[in-house]
C-alpha cells in the first residue's frame, strides 16, 4: 500500500523524538552515528517540520495546525501537488510559544541524545524566517558547531535571507 510521504513525520509509534520500530531503536541510531563519526563521517539528520495525520501532536495539540471551517486539516499545497498526507505546522498559532519550544526540544534531543551535528532542513523557505533566526540562535548558544543546511530550491534573495537567519 501507499505508506505516504517520507516527510509526513510521526505515527502511532511516536513523533519527532522517536524512531519507527521497523527502522530500529534510538540505541541503534546512536550506534550508527557513533560508527559513522569514528570513520570521519557526519550523519545529517532531516529536520522536516510537518506531521503525518497520525502524529501524536495532531491529537494532543490540534492548535498547532491549521484547520478548515469544516474541521478538516488545511493541507500544504504546492501546485499542482496537494500534500494530503502531511499536516503543516501553524507557526503563528496562539500557542506558538509552546510549539516553538517543542520544535527546539526536538532539535536538541537529536543533538544531545544522538550527537547529531548537521541538520538538513526541509523547505525552510516555506516557514517564517524569524522562526529560523530564533531556533538556530538558541541552538548555537549551546552547540555552536551544529550546521543547518537549507533544502530550498528558490530565488537567491530568499537563500540570502536564510543565510542571515543562520543557515550554513
Predicted regions, residues:
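Short beta-strand segments at enzyme active-site cores
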Residues: 1, 43-47, 120-121
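Hydrophobic beta-strand scaffold residues
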Residues: 40-43, 148
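Catalytic PLP-binding core of fold-type I/II PLP enzymes
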Residues: 37
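Active-site beta->alpha N-cap acidic-glycine motif
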Residues: 16, 46-52
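Surface-exposed intrinsically disordered loops and tails
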Residues: 3-9
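Alpha-amylase-like alpha-glycosidases and glucanotransferases acting on alpha-linked glucans and related
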Residues: 9-12, 19-23, 27-30, 34, ...
Amino acid at each position: 500500500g501507499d505508506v505516504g510521504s517520507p516527510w509526513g513525520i510521526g505515527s502511532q509509534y511516536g513523533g519527532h523524538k522517536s524512531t519507527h520500530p521497523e527502522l530500529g531503536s534510538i540505541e541503534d541510531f546512536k550506534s550508527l552515528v557513533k560508527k559513522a563519526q569514528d570513520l570521519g563521517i557526519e550523519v545529517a539528520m532531516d529536520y522536516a517540520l510537518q506531521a503525518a495525520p497520525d502524529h501524536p501532536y495532531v491529537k494532543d495539540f490540534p492548535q498547532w495546525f491549521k484547520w478548515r471551517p469544516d474541521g478538516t486539516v488545511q493541507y500544504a499545497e504546492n501546485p499542482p501537488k496537494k500534500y494530503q498526507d502531511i499536516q503543516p505546522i501553524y507557526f503563528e498559532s496562539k500557542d506558538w510559544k509552546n510549539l516553538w519550544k517543542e520544535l527546539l526540544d526536538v532539535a536538541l534531543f537529536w543533538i544531545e541524545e544522538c550527537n547529531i551535528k548537521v541538520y538538513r532542513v526541509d523547505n525552510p523557505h516555506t516557514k517564517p524566517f524569524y522562526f529560523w533566526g530564533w531556533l538556530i540562535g538558541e541552538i548555537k548558544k549551546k552547540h555552536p558547531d551544529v550546521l543547518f543546511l537549507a533544502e530550498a530550491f528558490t530565488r537567491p534573495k530568499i537563500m540570502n535571507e536564510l543565510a542571515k537567519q543562520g543557515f550554513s
